[in-house]
Amino acid sequence: MKTIAITLPDFFPNEAEAINRLFAEGSIDLLHLRKPDSTIDECRQLLDNIRNEYYKRIVVNDHFALCAEYNLHGVHLNRRNPTPPPCHQGSVSCSCHSLEEVVERKPKMDYVFLSPIFDSISKQGYHSAFDEATLKKASAEGIIDQKVVALGGVTHERMAQLQEYGFGGGAMLGDLWR
């Protein structure tokens, strides 16, 4: 099962060191660099302080030009950036908020996030949208599989439960950075 880290939306002191440590400790497989209000130069400054050996494990949610510039793992589509750049060679992922959306978007993606699976740690009042029976049924029907990554309230302690539901991994934000 993959463990994916999502950065906090704002930069913080020694962030690159924290990211390097997560990779070095084997705590994460991929990192989604998600800084929606950042400039491309601010993201470059962060990337310049991350060890280049980890670049192939970083996905950008904004400033897609950084993917080719730093030879990163891929891009994550969103409302701000709904399509990959021309001639993009890396992975392409997106976020889904319903099982219907997973069915529609998963075939065109390398992987998708499905959220919120549990009550969010980082977003107050953002509650789980799926009960256990729904997740087990979706897994049995092949909707949830190795290409679907759980997001929302994911912790290291919940990874075994996500594996039981058939997810290919879990994405963490709040649990990693608090």
Language model features: what each stretch is:
Residues 9, 58-64, 94-103, 117, ...:
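Glycine-rich beta-to-alpha transition loops that act as phosphate-gripper elements at the mouths
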Residues 1-17, 93-95, 150:
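Active-site mouth loops of central-metabolism enzymes
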Residues 2-4, 28-32, 57-59, 73-76, ...:
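Structural preference for beta-strand elements that scaffold enzyme active sites
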Residues 5, 75-85, 111-126, 151-178:
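Glycine-rich phosphate-binding active-site loops on the catalytic face of alpha/beta enzymes
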Residues 23-24, 28-88:
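N-terminal active-site wall of soluble small-molecule enzyme domains
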Residues 44-60, 87-99, 127-150:
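Alpha-helix-loop-beta-strand connector modules within alpha/beta enzyme cores
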Residues 70, 78-79, 90-140:
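Glycine/Thr-rich beta-alpha phosphate-binding loop at enzyme active sites
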Residues 17-29, 80, 102-114, 161:
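Alpha/beta enzyme core
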